[in-house]
């Protein structure tokens, strides 16, 4: 009979409408004969083909259901009347099971007898019987049944009534792991995995139970005639999670790994796992990790990278102490590095595993110089170069390789080798990658290799163009690294400077200096690091301007002149340079005054904007130059004294003192040199703004003149004094004589100073000062005598 599906509705099954004569839907009997010839054509193993075992008469199933329903009803009635007693199972542990519910369902008889569903489904379901009659609430609150109710029933529990509700003991787990039966191994894995992932290994089995479990897990990794890939994969994951946690007890688990590895490495100790010794847990894992296209390959590599790169493990097995230099340790170092580099050479190795191998090489090379030398001899730098060329779409691998390259290129030999292979150009070709973290690592490595002399032999035109485009970025780290790379890349190669000028690097650098306040409004977790980055950007941009305007003999003068003209034509350059000379640190002051001096000497018209331009503290440029010169001269003297008394200081502290002394010396020389130019050749207003503080005795240049001055400072200082005292208006006011009189200088001082100096320019200028001072003193004396005579005549 045809039944309209749209008009047929499923009815809820209740005790009132239950009819045991109705066939259950839990099992559909197969017709006696195939309904069509199509069924006859099906293959013999098809579940839809008529089989002998399901060719039973259809009425036998109905009779079976009738008998089961009668039994269910009787058991249920007995339980509702309170006369049903749960049977006591054999053994010490009592297991209580409820009778099947009168409700017909698709659940099997085994399901109703399971420990969980006997209480949860049968007792708590609204479709079941009234539980108050049987005092069910008191019954289930008795331990240990309450704990069973607190756990959510899973499908696996319903399907497997023998599934355990409590953790296995350590001996049971070890026995199951050592078993060759898959079901036993799987049971141990199911018992271990959730507890280990939750960090409860020691709390559950204690140290005495956890250590044998770890040994048994490693024994699972030893190749067997019959093994399951999923079991091996899970063993790797459990071992990985056991050393991954960072709680207080993790060191206790680490020591279990250490003891097992030490036992394997000891050639004279008792046998372990029936493997030839010396051996190690690293080799156990590597044996599995090298098996490609398996389910456990990636899990093995993840465990290996943690065993190699975890700081505590590196300290114990890969350090440089004498305890790590035994033959067994040296053998381990060699095997691990050869495995990692061999994996990089194999074309069939997955990109993820290559990235993990790169991390192993990087961390172990950082920890142990011997391992680093071993890696270099095996050609690891060339392998890194190949990865950067070929694996351009795998971000994780590129990122790990860039970190390792930065470490290895810190050595001049490796960095030079990488640059000579064209590595700098390869790195610049990846600057368009969309990953920010990869871009950071690329620029870090570029900044390091661009400081090597080997870069001057490379054609970096296209690379420079790519880097210049990045310095306008809003990312502080990218701007710092990009400007640092440009600073280094133009230091050794004159052609690189010319390429930078052609790409308009002067305008870009000034724009970054002008808009650098945008970085101060960006939120940052580490404020101190953030400030250091911003200061580094300032110094890098000013250094770039200093490099491209340099006119040393090895530089291209036309390129430097072009850079000076570009700076002079920039409307913001004067304000920017004056600002950083005024409020910057000593590095910024030194670089800013150097650039100003070069540009004004090359393009004299660049001095005009400074005539009316005031600094942040409202002083004009000449006053600022003189103030900074006096301040740096004082710092130079103090630092020189410290240098003489630094016998007990470290080499780094002495280098810092020497660097500070040189910076202050350069500030004095270039500030005074620029003042000389402004007062002798530029707009007269520069001298007039300076004349007032010179004549009132506030800043007398002779007061700072000492025998301790270096030749460089003394030459610029004397040239400045002669330039301001040789002007017509200065000669008319006898400025030289006034300075000498205020400072109480004598000819004997200048004669002694002249005798100590071998520089002919200094001797010539000292002679001019002596002659001019003597001449003006004579004129002043004559005028004074004439004034006295006139006064005497008036009195007469």
UniProtKB/Swiss-Prot annotation:
GO cellular component terms given for this protein: adherens junction; catenin complex; cell cortex; cytoplasm; nucleus; serine/threonine protein kinase complex
Gene disruption: observed consequences: Worms exhibit premature cell cleavage during embryogenesis, symmetrical cell division during gonadogenesis and undifferentiated intestines. Embryos show a defect in centrosome positioning that delays ABar spindle alignment and appear to lack endoderm.
Taxonomic lineage of the native organism: Eukaryota, Metazoa, Ecdysozoa, Nematoda, Chromadorea
Compartment annotation: Cytoplasm, Cell cortex; Nucleus
Assembly and binders: Interacts (independently of ARM repeat) with nhr-25. Component of the beta-catenin-lit-1 complex (also called the lit-1/wrm-1 complex or the wrm-1/lit-1 kinase complex) at least composed of lit-1 and wrm-1. Interacts (via N-terminus) with lit-1; the interaction is direct and activates lit-1 kinase activity which leads to the phosphorylation of pop-1. This promotes pop-1 interaction with par-5 and translocation of pop-1 from the nucleus to the cytoplasm.
Keyword annotations of the record: Activator, Cytoplasm, Developmental protein, Nucleus, Transcription, Transcription regulation, Wnt signaling pathway
First and last residues of every ARM repeat: 462-504
Function: Antagonistic role in the Wnt signaling pathway that operates in embryogenesis. When located at the cortex it has been shown to inhibit Wnt signaling during asymmetric cell division but when relocated to the nucleus it shows positive regulation. Has a role in blastomere signaling during endoderm specification. Component of the beta-catenin-lit-1 complex which promotes phosphorylation, down-regulation and subcellular relocation of pop-1. Within the complex, activates lit-1-dependent kinase activity. Can substitute for bar-1 indicating functional redundancy.
Keyword Cytoplasm: yes
Protein's UniProt name: Armadillo repeat-containing protein wrm-1
Any single biological process term in GO: embryo development ending in birth or egg hatching
Cross-referenced InterPro entries: ARM-like, ARM-type_fold, Armadillo, Beta-catenin
Gene source species: Caenorhabditis elegans
Region spans: Disordered: 17-59
Any one GO molecular-function label of the UniProt entry: nuclear receptor binding
